[in-house]
Amino acid sequence: SAPELPEGLIVNGRVDRLVVTEEEVLIIDFKTDQPAPDSPDGVAETYRAQMAAYWAVLQRAYPGRTVRTALCWTDGPRLMFLPEEMLLEALKGAQSAV
């Protein structure tokens, strides 16, 4: 089932690239303002929260499909997928902030 968004959380944003197939939804956000970190663990909390919100919303919009998120760092270019556990943790952090 889709993860719960924190009550009172307003999601306002625009997905840079959305790839939808019969089995999968891929959310890609381009990052142009800094070099890519070495791993997803180095991704800024704000980016984690942003992608977690997109992920949660699009899981509801596309039930039954795998939803994945990735950041495209344009300095490389480099495509970095964010693990589901990281997204769930970011949603928990948003819950405590609301």
Give each language-model segment a name:
Residues 1-98:
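Structural signature of nuclease core domains in nucleic-acid processing machines
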